[in-house]
Amino acid sequence: MTYCCAISVDAGIVFCSDSRTNAGVDQVSTYSKMFTFDKGVDRQFVILAAGNLATTQATLAHLKKDVRQNAETSLNTVSSIGDAADYVGEVSRMMQEKHGKTGHGYEASFLLGGQIMGSHHRVVMIYPEGNHITSSADTPYIQIGESKYGKPILDRIIKLDTPLETAALCALVSMDSTMRSNLTVGPPIEMLVYHTDSYSLQNYHRFEEDDEYLRELKKSWDSYLKSAFHQLPPLAWAANWKKIAEGNSGIY
């Protein structure tokens, strides 16, 4: 399984992904799901991938080949993030059709984020069908893969004016919550922070399984959650609570 998230706030974008690929209890491997395209002088892109490994690898290989060979259409030539998303979606569909593997089981989805000079930074999610959606002011983050466990903390914390450092910490807590509830998601954890208008992808870190900071984060978050839970107001069966009428309770 996979978990990737990209958080787009006013100050920039945070990208976070796990590196565990699971094809059964006895087939667990490590593959990076974060890919950078940073050779353009006026643009920077990061792609996070989830889904069929063969499809994602073929898609990324084709994207890199187009850049390397100065193709007419590539991530170095598109004029907007939306055009970049359309292009990646088209390549993904082409890779599936080339090998006759369209349909469930061979699908892949992508998070594409970055900035082209003269426009604002953006994050988009590209579906297996090739269409895409973008993050919004109401929901400044997008997830792919095993998203449900890490979503609550993002909903509570992330706003457009959230500082990048806070967004990065929130992404790691989101990842920790996912790893705790789903063993098919796991380290190494990759994180990259892009500062708006910097056109630089230098703020990258890879957290290994035995990383001291990850262990401390997990321990602290667990402790603070338990402490907060025990400080909740006690459940009081107040006199004004609606009583269950005898014979009309619906309880059998």
Label for each model-derived stretch:
Residues 1, 7-8, 27-28, 37-41, ...:
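Solvent-exposed alpha-helices and their adjacent loops that cap or buttress functional pockets
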Residues 1-4, 11-12, 43-45, 107-110, ...:
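Short, surface-exposed beta-edge/turn micro-motifs
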Residues 4-100, 144-155, 159-162, 216-241, ...:
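Conserved short S/T/G-enriched processing/targeting/catalytic segments and their helical context
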Residues 49-50, 113-115:
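Short His-Asn-centered micro-motif
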Residues 91-98, 107-108, 114-115, 120-252:
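A two-mode feature
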